[in-house]
Amino acid sequence: MREGAFDASRKKGGTQRPSSLSTAQPPSDSRPPSSSSPPSSSSSSSSASSSSPSHPPRPFPSASSPWFPTCEASAEKMDRAQTDSRQEPILRPVAAGEEASPAFVPWQTRAFSPIARGSLRGSVLTLASSCLGAGVLATPYAMQETGLLIGLSLLCMHTFVSFFTTYILMASSKFFGSSTYAELAHRASPRLPRRAVDAIIVLNGLGVCLSFLVFLGDFLPASLENLQLFPRATDHRAALLCASMVVIFPLSVQPRLSALRHFAFFPVCALLFSLSCVVYRSLHLLREQTAPIRLVNLNWNFFKSFNVFLFAFMQHINVCPIGRELQNPTDPRVYKVSLRAALLEYCLYTPIATLGYLSFRGVTKQNFMLNYSSEDQLMHVCTLLLSFSMVLGVPLTLIPTVDSMFSLLRSLAPAPRRAARAALGEAPRRRSLVAPLLHAERTDGLVRVTVSLAFEKEGGLGDAEYGGAEAGEATRGCGEGVESPGEVQPEQADAGARNRDRSRLHADSERSAGDREGSQAEEEREEERSGEERSVVTATQASRCEGSSSASSRSVDSGSGGCQDACESRETRTRFLALEEEPSGDREAREEREEREEREGQGRRGGELLLLMGRVLENRKVCVAACLLPVLLLALVLDKAADVVGLLGGFFSTLLMSALPSIIFYAGIGNLYYRPFTRSLLMVFLLGVTCVGAFSSVIIILQTFNVCCQVPRSVLH
């Protein structure tokens, strides 16, 4: 059947290949060239690559049109090649910049190869490392407050919420073409203000960093003192937290999360080692416990446990940056990243929460690692490793937080005017009307090279006294070997014709002026004519730049590097002469108008002080230091980790993890790929999680200030 269909397709004119692998195939009657003939495929491929330098995006894989042929099809082609005594390419030649499919690479090579930027492993580990640490250490305490059965049910529910919302954000960021959480929310629902989302991300990031530092202050001094590495380390908790900034600060100033991809594996390894130690110690501790195991324990602390479990899966501020850096972000790869990250977190959280609760029953502390004996050296090694993972968790959270802070500052403080920049000693910058000679614009699937052509002598000013001859000679040499776009050539002809008409009119007017009395009036008319001519030249130059930027890709000769300098010098001379010959009244009016606008702008933004503050805050190092300082001061005075985690999970995690993804889902991919009933049901479920999380935050606040909702100690024991 397959061979018959294949032969029929060859008779029609070529081999039918999948859409993502389709290449130009010769007809069946044309035999492939022999070994003596020159290889035409390479020349055709090179010409094709030169004409279209960018590859179109591949369609999503499906069962009907896979990216690569199946094994049966490959075997049939190999048999046919052997019988016909000729060799046909099974796959199309891989162009430069493309990578082989992972399906053809053995899993051993993929598993133990270095982690590349934007790979599946790097994305999964970065997502998992973003939430491992502070949340997982409070899960045994949350399991104690709710009971074993309810705690496991909450873990399963929050795992699904984490997976589904991560997939929503990553797929929607590709759908809307956005790279930040705030931009994605604003594009999905324009009613959502971008500043509010950025502010939520900033506050959530600072709170998460606070929880990391609180746990670090509990772990690091105790482990160093019990391992006899630093005697009396518990008395120097503040000094150790300040010393950790030496490692946290350099990692936090990195502009991208992919810079930390080689460190993202360490928190996972540290937690795996801690899990193995918890399992080993639980074999002895379970036999010593006599308290009953509670399967269901409903009280007011249920809401605190709900938020603790929710915060344990909080990774969503890093989803959009990771999706932006993901290589080949197709739907299957996005699905794999979301599912694998959620399953990895669930497989680590469930045994730690269960065994941590069963090992200590009703006396589990908010940081369950503090329940172990102070003489247990093995657990102190675990706490030391977890301390290092906390140190790495702060930069993973702070990098997207600083990006949102930059976006918030840019939206609050508009770009300063030229006089305000000059007041601070900054030289004003003029926008050039000429685009760069070789301007490369890179998008997801397109690399476009545009060429800006310089003026010829006819299209220039035309006067030798203004340097037109020198500029014409310079541009004449630059134009050799550069193919002019078809859209620009009619404009050049029109500009040359207009300049020739003006030169003839100028010559006729000079011949008609026979007396000296009208020479002054003639000079004034000549100045007006030259001013109009320069304005026409400037407009023509701008239209040429636009036409050249929208033209298709052209090959540029290696000797055309001086063409850009000639264009820029010609444009600068034109603007300078136009400013020199501007009437004094117009110049004074223009300067007065600029000064008035300057004073109004300074009054709105608070003057030069606000401008200087904006310049300082645009520095990433200053912004990171401004974020870490208040977080460090709060970590020095706080010691209740679960309360901090519960408040964060209620106020911010519910917004970023369920509320905003539900709105993005309903307005974006849910409106396209889901039925109305399914879409509404999922949105109601996510909004329900949001409401419970917000109500839990209120309960935690009331319990903290001893207002109400207190749980008797007899219920816990």
From Swiss-Prot:
Keyword Transmembrane attributed: yes
Stored InterPro entries: AA_transpt_TM
Subcellular location: Vacuole membrane
Record's keyword terms, sorted: Amino-acid transport, Membrane, Transmembrane, Transmembrane helix, Transport, Vacuole
GO cellular component: vacuolar membrane
MF (Gene Ontology): L-amino acid transmembrane transporter activity
Bias type Basic and acidic residues, positions: 1-10, 74-88, 497-519, 584-602
Membrane topology: Multi-pass membrane protein
Loss of function: phenotype: Reduced survival of extracellular parasites. Altered morphology in bradyzoites. Increased cyst burden in chronically infected mice. Unstable inter-conversion between tachyzoites and bradyzoites.
Keyword check for Transmembrane helix: yes
Bias (Low complexity): 26-53, 463-477, 547-558
Function: Putative amino acid transporter. Probably transports arginine. Involved in maintaining the osmotic homeostasis of the digestive vacuole. Required for extracellular parasite survival and bradyzoite differentiation.
Xref: PANTHER family: AMINO ACID TRANSPORTER (PTHR22950)
Family: Belongs to the amino acid/polyamine transporter 2 family.
Entry protein name: Putative amino acid transporter AAT1
Organism: Toxoplasma gondii (strain ATCC 50611 / Me49)
